[in-house]
């Protein structure tokens, strides 16, 4: 909502997309380091540091008088967000037992859907009575309340003692070289051959990383934890995040551009996805008592396949789209929550925090890959079932089929 105003006020021109790019790069850099920090510092200190970074970044964004300052501020804000997003996957394990953990993680996972309604309403209200700077200032009192709650509640008796092991500099360096190559391949739009070469180099670096980390007593990336089940979960989460971007980013665009709905109206159409997400997680322990893990996963992938195909056929009635999104919400609700819990429960207690940090990174990389791929597909003016959104959801359908095959063969 505020991008046109920011672009004009700060003379950003075609560089306006850096507002998102800088934030995302910082977020991805911060994600994996959280696990290492938690092995050396109490979680309460890491959480406060993340909130302070986010608050300082938000404050600086609001004070920005030029585009360079805004981008630097977004990087700081992104670092704070990266820390907090990783903690959102770790804290439920320390604080709650199953089945309550399912409910909490369902609420956490569906926050984006709730924000799709609150965001346009709140943002539009702020821009109606104030300048875009207050879109950032509003984060500060919220962060202060969060810091108070962290100080009050983040005391976990099961938290491990602080590690004294040597820092794995080589593993960290190789890992961030790998991430840098992946990010370049995702963000570069000049010479596509460089993207391909970057992916090839990333694979080579990843192989070196796995070889090195196998022989380190306290590795930055605990590769020994990646058994068949954990590896399958990471792949599933990466692909599911790609699919979620198809729904999260481009169904609202379709509703507004093709069907003429307002941002608030499109948010209301999408909201049933979040309701279904939360509802399923509140009843997940009952479902698991009757069905096996494999069966529920396969049902979830099937629901995602069915919902994407139905919308791909070009339905234009918002009420019907909202109903179909309930199916997608049930699918995403199970996959995301169960993936998180599997990593929490099936990795060793000593490495759980690191693994959950990398899990969060996988989710964010999937979101980045998804937004890029789905953006290209949405821009295509013809497809299997028609233009724009239908290309996006056709890709979701293909990925859903791939996930079904993956779980049938490897689980």
Regions found by a protein language model. Give the residues of each.
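12-transmembrane solute porter fold
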Residues: 1, 11-14, 20-22, 32, ...
